[in-house]
Every structure is written in structure tokens, then in C-alpha cells.
Amino acid sequence: MKPVLVLAILAVLFLRLADSVPRPLNVVVSEIKSAHFRVEENQCWFHMGMLYFKGRMSGNFTKKHFVNVGIVSQSYMDRLQVSGEQYHHDERGAYFEWNIGGYPVSHTVDMVDITLSTRWGDPKKYAACVPQVRMDYSSQTINWYLQRSMRDDNWGLLFRTLLVYLFSLVVLVLLTVGVSARLRFI
């Protein structure tokens, strides 16, 4: 009973420490000074080593415009371009929507760039999104979370990752030992 109490106290302390570290927020950085285009929604997050992002941009669009969503990393070799936008036109005007989920990325990804261009023009960065890290409870992505926390010096994420992983191992061992002990006496 005492080890369980000690583990519970340590879990509360680690989770409080993890919550005291500020997490990255969704950031919208407008770089085109124009009243013609507006970002209405811009969200991105990491979950299970995958990148999810969705958003909406409205303005004076024509079919010649297109929005490109790119993933920016610390290394230039990881500069990826992801295209999943959809052009819409209704009574409120023209807008672009993107909803890209489950894109596998390395732990070095820093930002999602949203660029706006025409078919003949150079793309201009219009907005950016800094992904939030959403913790999961699977051991498949433990390595990704450990690398990300060490790269960012995010001690809260490191402690949460280790705590969740160790807790899942303890539960697995207790279940395995309990099942094998029950089977032995049946």
C-alpha cells in the first residue's frame, strides 16, 4: 500500500510541475498587410507523433489563388509542402479551408506555415501556427515524445512522458503477474 501512495504523490508532483511549464499556443502571424484576406481559424497540434492542422481563410479569392500549407523544421531537409486545401464560394464570399490530419512528422518540426499565392506569383507567408503537444498514453510514440522534450528543454513534457510510460509498465506487470498467479491456481 505504501508504494502505491508514494507513486500517487509523485504522479501529482510531476503533473503539477508539467502544468507549471508554459505550453506553446496557437499563434497567428499575419505578414501580408491587406484587408482583402483574413485568417478565421488556425489550429495545429501534435498527437501520437503525427501533425494535425486545420483552418479557414476568407477574402477576395478567385480560382487563380491557392493556399499552400507547409511544415517548417529546424533542418532545411525536412521542409515539406502539404497540400490539402479546398476552395469554396458561397453567399458570404470565397474562402479556403484546410483540414489535414495524421501527417507523420519528425520531432524537429517547429511550425506550420500557411502561404497564399496565385498560379503565377511567388507564395507569400500569410500565417503561421506553432503546434501544441497533446499527450497520449501509448508506448508507440514514447521515443518521439522523449526526443521532442529533450530538444525543447521541456522538462514538464519529459516528466509526463516518463511518468505515463512507467505507470503503463507497472500496470502491465501487475496485470501479467495477477493473471499468471490466477492461472496457476485454477
Curated annotation (Swiss-Prot):
Classification via SUPFAM superfamilies: E set domains (SSF81296)
This protein's GO CC annotations: host cell endoplasmic reticulum membrane; membrane
Highest taxon listed in the record's lineage: Viruses
UniProt keywords, alphabetically: Disulfide bond, Early protein, Glycoprotein, Host endoplasmic reticulum, Host membrane, Host-virus interaction, Immunoglobulin domain, Lectin, Mannose-binding, Membrane, Signal, Transmembrane, Transmembrane helix, Viral immunoevasion
GO molecular function: D-mannose binding
Pfam families with a match to the protein in the record: Cytomega_US3
Residue ranges of the TM segments: 161-181
Signal sequence bounds: 1-20
Subcellular location field: Host endoplasmic reticulum membrane
Modification after translation: The signal sequence is not cleaved.
Role according to the record: Retains, but does not degrade MHC class I heterodimers in the endoplasmic reticulum during the immediate-early period of virus infection, thereby impairing their transport and maturation. Forms a complex with beta-2-microglobulin-associated class I heavy chains, which accumulate in the ER. In consequence, infected cells are masked for immune recognition by cytotoxic T-lymphocytes.
Homology family: Belongs to the cytomegalovirus US2 family.
The protein's assembly and partners: Monomer.
Protein name listed in UniProt: Membrane glycoprotein US3
Record organism: Human cytomegalovirus (strain Merlin) (HHV-5)
